[in-house]
């Protein structure tokens, strides 16, 4: 941990029993493992109130929930490709940049909680009409891109505990 400094990795793998103590600045991920993960966490991620930025323009996946009970603090996904996630908790904010899509890796069992704000500036966030995930947000701000609300044909739902603002994007509901 280099407090307040920035760190850049091709990918981040935390093995079972291992710990990554993140900087309180920004940890940038620019590639993925041979297994297709920009982050593959089977251990403990200590966020130190820092930001993780995915800056990779090829489809990849995020496995950010390890065994330590703490997920990411801030996450920025800046990608022109699809980024998939498993069940995840973002302790503060999730920002979506780039023309790509961020979505759960399957139609069921991948719930997302963003305790702060989902800020969608470009690209798309969400899944299709058969989605059975529950996505929970403190707030949502759509400045651009497309927010695909969970629900419709599946049993999934989108929960917003605070404010929901669309100031320049598209909202799609299935």
Protein language model annotation of sequence segments:
Residues 1-89, 95-174:
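Extracellular beta-strand-rich, repetitive "passenger/adhesive" scaffolds
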């Amino acid at each position: 941990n280099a407090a307040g400094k920035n760190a850049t990795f091709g990918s981040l793998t935390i093995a079972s029993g291992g710990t990554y103590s993140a900087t309180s600045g920004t940890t940038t991920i620019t590639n993925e493992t041979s297994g297709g993960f920009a982050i593959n966490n089977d251990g403990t991620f200590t966020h130190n109130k820092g930001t993780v930025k995915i800056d990779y323009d090829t489809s990849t996946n995020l496995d950010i929930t390890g065994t330590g009970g703490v997920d990411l603090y801030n996450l920025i996904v800046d990608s022109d490709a699809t980024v998939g996630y498993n069940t995840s908790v973002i302790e503060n904010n999730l920002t979506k940049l780039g023309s790509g899509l961020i979505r759960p890796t399957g139609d069921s069992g991948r719930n997302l909680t963003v305790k702060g704000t989902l800020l969608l500036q470009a690209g798309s966030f969400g899944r299709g009409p058969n989605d059975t995930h529950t996505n929970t947000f403190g707030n949502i701000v759509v400045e651009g891109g497309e927010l695909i609300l969970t629900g419709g044909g599946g049993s999934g739902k989108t929960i917003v505990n605070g404010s929901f603002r669309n100031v320049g994007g598209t909202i799609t509901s299935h």
